[in-house]
Amino acid sequence: MGLYAAPTYLANAGMPLHPKNLEAAPHHIVGFLGSSTGRVLSCVLHRGDEQVRVMGRYAIATDDGNAYLAAGVAGLGALWLPQYMAAPHLARGELAPLFEDWSIAPMPLYIAFPPNRHMGARLRVFMDWMVELMKTHAPLSGAVPHRR
């Protein structure tokens, strides 16, 4: 996971020097709404013994991943993403990394299905594909995919 912002956002708001700077004007954050609470998820960054929870001024908040990413790329505010999602936008110059000496805990990914049903071949193939896909990106995020 990393914290990113569009170059247009940084040109307008300036480069924040510390994560807490994102909580004050002129900075904004693109908020992501948690599915279980409907509240904006906070971002917790770590550097050595220092831990900072960022709850900033939200330009927009959404529960849709595509809208979340589009808002960040459009320059509406800073956002946190898994590195594999940010990588193509970094390569195209649409996003720039912030606070590279800080870390954010990886975001868990779950596959949910009814436990009382037989696991069909399609579901098994999908689950195997997801595990392999995440293994490819695990070195980027520090996550270790596993299977039950």
Where would I find each of the regions flagged by the language model?
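Small-molecule pocket liners
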Residues: 1-3, 7-8, 27, 43, ...
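Flexible hinge/capping segments at coil-to-helix
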Residues: 4-30, 48
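Residues that scaffold the ATP/ADP-binding catalytic core of kinase and kinase-like folds
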Residues: 12-13, 32, 89, 98
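Ligand-binding cleft/hinge of the Venus flytrap
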Residues: 19, 41-55, 89
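Secondary-structure junction motif
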Residues: 28-48
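Hydrophobic hinge/microswitch elements
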Residues: 51-97, 104, 116, 127
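C-terminal effector-binding regulatory domain of bacterial HTH transcription factors
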Residues: 83-88, 92, 102-148
